[in-house]
A protein has these predicted regions:
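Mid/C-terminal beta-alpha module of Rossmann-like enzyme folds, strongest
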Residues: 204-263, 274, 279, 296, ...
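Substrate-positioning beta->alpha
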Residues: 162-170, 183-206, 213-214, 228, ...
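N-terminal Rossmann NAD(P)H-binding glycine-rich loop of SDR-like oxidoreductase domains
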Residues: 3-23
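Conserved glycine-rich Rossmann-like NAD(P)H-binding loop of the short-chain dehydrogenase/reductase
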Residues: 26-32
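NAD(P)-dependent short-chain dehydrogenase/reductase
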Residues: 140-189, 232-235
Length: 334
């Protein structure tokens, strides 16, 4: 099977690329060549997907069984992909987001039939618009699309809600005995999925004829509350977390991004029903528990000092919010 990834070297997609190559898939990566690619066996097509004429020339005369765009975020990019790829593939897979599901939810158990609506996050609304365009072109023109919605997925990032992502800040902060923020009272439920588990559900969808016209989320079945998540991160770093619980609304007052990140996503208890992906991919099961996966992630950061970057803005944000909250809290009569 001949497959083209637009992207393919990121936090989620690298694991998919590795699994695809291990299964003998003829994998091409379309990228700008700015990131070192450690994927033996993958072929590279150099180009910028935003330069449509350049890409049209690069794929002229080529046909791929599957094309996956890992880095499409707005409807205009979907329109471009429809123009570019309609005659070059039998399956186009769009990477959407599980953050598109209804917020606030009418039911905590989320399936692919859960309504799509997120008034808190423009990122999610753009992904919804992308899906709507793909569903329309599938219905009206038979464009062979499949939609996949990752949720909070990690490998080479630290998947906390506040304090880190592609940086080491939250770990450094814990190791130095500083306070960290957990939104709300830390008891809302959440699902975090390792990229290798995601890959085991994703790769079998490639070339799957019955997946055409369908949407899927692919997550772990492990539900943890946020206290457990931060405690697992601390345990993996061999420290204790000094948690300060702060209401999400209060946190969001300090940073517009947190409106979407918390109120439109991570502050909302969510339990994913993965029965659909298990029907289409018999035997799929996520096997990496978070306490084991996050230990691997921290070891990955600490293997190379250059990865252990500290973002001063993350420390400043946490210090600012904690100080303001503690002042308010202390002013309330006991």
């Amino acid at each position: 099977m001949k497959v083209l990834f637009i992207g393919g070297t990121g936090n989620i997609s690298s694991a998919v690329s590795r699994l695809a190559l291990s299964q003998g898939i003829d994998l091409y990566l379309l990228n700008r060549g700015k990131r070192r690619v450690d994927l033996p066996g993958a072929r590279t097509i150099l180009g910028d997907i935003n330069q449509e004429k350049e890409i049209a020339k690069a794929i002229d005369g080529k046909y791929f069984d599957v094309i996956v765009n890992w880095i499409a975020f707005v409807p205009g990019e979907i329109e471009r992909d429809i123009r570019l790829f309609r005659r070059h593939t039998s399956q186009y897979i769009f990477i959407s987001s599980a953050s598109i599901y209804q917020k606030p939810p009418s039911h905590p158990v989320v399936s692919e039939s859960t309504p799509l609506a997120n008034p808190f996050w423009q990122y999610s609304r753009d992904k919804i618009a992308c899906e709507e365009r793909l569903n329309r072109v599938y219905r009206e023109e038979g464009f062979p699309m499949t939609i996949v919605r990752p949720s909070h997925t990690y490998d080479t990032v630290i998947p906390v809600a506040i304090g880190s992502w592609d940086d080491y800040t939250i770990i450094d902060r814990m190791k130095n005995g500083k306070k960290i923020i957990v939104h709300g009272d830390g008891t809302s439920l959440w699902t975090i999925t390792h990229s290798e588990d995601f890959a085991r559900g994703f790769v079998p969808l490639m070339g799957h004829q019955q997946a055409i016209g369908q949407s899927f989320h692919i997550t772990s079945d492990e539900s943890l509350n946020w206290n457990q998540i931060y405690q697992a991160v601390a345990a993996a770093a061999d420290v204790e977390a000094k948690i300060v619980h702060i209401p999400s609304d209060f946190i969001a007052k300090f940073d517009e991004f947190q409106v979407g990140n918390l109120l439109g996503d991570k502050a909302v208890s969510t339990i994913f029903d993965n029965s659909k992906i298990k029907r289409f991919v018999p035997g799929y099961v996520a096997t990496i528990p978070f306490n084991a996966g996050i230990k691997r992630t921290i070891e990955w950061f600490e293997k190379e000092p250059s990865r252990m970057r500290i973002k001063p803005e993350n420390n400043h944000f946490m210090d600012q919010v904690i100080e303001a909250y503690e002042q308010v809290f202390e002013s309330v009569p006991s």
